[in-house]
Amino acid sequence: MEMIGGDDTDTEMYGALVTAQSLRLRHLHHCRENQCTSVLVKYIQAPVHLVWSLVRRFDQPQKYKPFISRCTVNGDPEIGCLREVNVKSGLPATTSTERLEQLDDEEHILGINIIGGDHRLKNYSSILTVHPEMIDGRSGTMVMESFVVDVPQGNTKDDTCYFVESLIKCNLKSLACVSERLAAQDITNSIATFCNASNGYREKNHTETNL
C-alpha cells in the first residue's frame, strides 16, 4: 500500500490502518467449520517490558494465571518444548499438555498449542502479543490474545467462544493486576533510592562544611 500526499490527519489514519493490519496478520488463525475463533484486547498501565517479562515465562504461567496451580516443563523453555499444567479444583479439567509454538522477544509474540489433557479444548491454539501504548500520558501496554478451538459435540460456537473468552478475560485481568502492582513497586523503589541518595549527598556536604 502506498500513500500519496495528505495532511497530518491522513498520516495518523494511515498509520493506524497499517498497525491494525499488522496486528491482524499476527493473529491470523485458520478456522475450520467445526471451530470457533476470537480475539481479546486488554490495556495495562505498566510498561511493555514488564508485562512481557511475565507473559514470556512459558515455564511459569502461574505467575499470573489464577487457574494454574503447578507447571512442569520438560527441558529448556524453547520452541517445541512441552509443559504439563495442573489446573486448580473447581474447573472442568485437572491437567493440560501444551507446546510452545512461538516465542519472539523482539516482536513480543507468544504462541501455544494445547495437545493433550483431560479437558474439552481440542486443537486449541492461541497467540498472545504485547504492544507499547500510551495510557493516561504514561507508558502502558496493549495485550492482544487470540485463539481457535474445536467446538465440542453438543455445544454451539457461541457457547464455546463464551467459555474460552471468560477464561482469557480472567487471565488478562490477573496479568494487569500483577503487572501494575510490580510497576508501582518499581516506582516506589526508584523514589526510595533517589531519596536515600539525596540524603547521603546532603549529609556529605554538611560534614564537609563543618570541617
Swiss-Prot record:
GO terms for biological process: abscisic acid-activated signaling pathway. One of its GO terms (cellular component) is cytoplasm. A motif (Latch loop) lies at residues 119-121. It is found in: Cytoplasm; Nucleus; Cell membrane. Abscisate binds at residues 65, 93-98, 120-126, 145. A motif (Gate loop) lies at residues 89-93. Its main location: cytoplasm. The record marks 66, 112, 164, 167 as: Involved in ABA binding. Coiled coil: none annotated. Disulfide bonds join 31-161, 36-161. The record marks 92, 156 as: Involved in interactions with PP2Cs. GO terms for molecular function: abscisic acid binding; protein homodimerization activity; protein phosphatase inhibitor activity; signaling receptor activity. Residues 29-180 are annotated as: START-like. Keywords: Abscisic acid signaling pathway, Cell membrane, Cytoplasm, Disulfide bond, Membrane, Nucleus, Protein phosphatase inhibitor, Receptor. Receptor for abscisic acid (ABA) required for ABA-mediated responses such as stomatal closure and germination inhibition. Inhibits the activity of group-A protein phosphatases type 2C (PP2Cs) when activated by ABA. Upon interaction with ABA, the 'latch' and 'gate' loops change in conformation leading to a tight dimerization and the creation a surface that enables the receptor to dock into and inhibit the PP2C active site. Homodimer. Binds ABA on one subunit only. Binds to CARs protein in an ABA-independent manner, both at the plasma membrane and in the nucleus. Interacts with ABI1, and possibly with other PP2Cs. PANTHER family: ABSCISIC ACID RECEPTOR PYL7, OS08G0374000 PROTEIN-RELATED. Belongs to the PYR/PYL/RCAR abscisic acid intracellular receptor family. This is Abscisic acid receptor PYL7. It comes from Arabidopsis thaliana.
